Amino acid sequence: MGCLRPIYVLFFCFVVRVYGQYEAYQWDEDYEQEPSEDYEPEFQFHQNIEYGAPFYQNILGCAKECFCPTNFPTSMYCDNRKLKTIPDIPMHIQQLNLQFNDIEAVTADSFINATHLKEINLSHNKIKSQKIDYGVFAKLSNLQQLHLDHNNLEEFPFPLPKSLERLLLGYNEISTLPTHAMDGLVNVTMLDLCYNHLSDSTLKGKILSKLEKLMQLNLCNNRLESMPPGLPLSLMYLSLENNSISSIPEDYFQKLPKLHALRISHNKLEDIPYDIFNLSNLIELNVGHNKLKQAFYIPRNLEHLYLQNNEIQSINVTMMCPSLDPLHHHHLTYLRVDQNKLKEPISSYIFFCFPRIHSIYYGEQRSTNGETIQLKTQVFRRYQDEEEEEEDDSQDHTLEGQEETEEHFNSHYYEMQAWQNTI
């Protein structure tokens, strides 16, 4: 028993030392001063040290219809509660979740006390433009994100605060954009207008050029017949799927040097300039489901190319890659060419031009009489890269695989991790 006493002493000293460190950290790091008898902090730490998240005193409150979690003291969750009106919002709330309700109006009093709001999610409700009081959002000088998608809006919700960075208006009935709608929105980086009723006349006058920091623009599933004019130089991701665009001006992309990804599938493109996509930063290009009859020049940094469901009868590799540069390889890794009118596989010369290519998806092809045929090659061809070959030199370089679903690559919202990190 005597030998255990020193252990008890050491353990007691260790506990005192650790506790003292925690106390020093709490005051030194959080308050940066010695506590006084009459000092009362605005918030205190939750008893569960694992979370380390502050929670506000009960006096700040929470709407009775909603839930305000202790670990996220500035968030209020009122989603999916069959609400017909916006509840009272405490002053300290910064993130407000009201999606999936039956809210029909946003009145001048809806956010009268909530001056610190940074994000409002009103998606999946029944809001109409006429039921949004003028200037109700513009008064929120800290607002950064506004979700109004999946409602019944007929007009753009103008005016909006200068602080706004992300604006989601998809799945509405918007058909007009006033010339002053984008005034003051100098910090918007992401604008989603997919699934509306926008036409060429709606975007005339280069209305979108006012968004000087815009990086992502979604205009899919509208009524556009030509490329949207006056897009800002800052744009990196452009979605134009499911419109009726039939041509692209030859110098159109010269004004978009930072473009990383372009999705213009399900349109009516037939003849496009040979080097129209000669963009040094372009990584993903989807021109599937058009009426293209031949391939085009492939920029050096392009990695994913989708040509499915066009009218292509043969692919001339020298058009895609007119010259070889052993010091600067092309980066193309994935090519999809199913549902075209190919009669034979692509020439093996493609692997000299694009040495990094991993996969070519041929799928089924369409014959002149409308029947589907399969080429005398694997439906899905994969090619090992150098690292895989080093691991297993004996493994066959081709194998069959399943078709990568179009939905995975063709979502109108950009879901690539790199995009999310950028925006």
From Swiss-Prot:
Disulfide bonds: 321-353
Residues in LRRNT domain copies: 53-91
Claim: Disulfide bond is one of the keywords in the record: yes
Chain positions of LRR repeats: 92-113, 116-129, 142-164, 165-184, 187-207, 213-233, 234-255, 258-279, 281-294, 301-322, 331-353
Free-text description of this protein's post-translational modifications in UniProt: Glycosylated; contains keratan sulfate.
TM helices/strands, residue ranges: none
Biased composition (Acidic residues): 385-394
Region of interest (Disordered), ranges: 383-408
Tissues of expression: Osteoblast and odontoblast. Expressed in femoral bone and calvaria tissues. Detected in femoral head, rib, tendon and bone marrow.
Subcellular localization, as worded in the UniProt entry: Secreted, Extracellular space, Extracellular matrix
Protein family per UniProt: Belongs to the small leucine-rich proteoglycan (SLRP) family. SLRP class II subfamily.
Protein's recorded name: Osteomodulin
Lineage: Eukaryota, Metazoa, Chordata, Craniata, Vertebrata
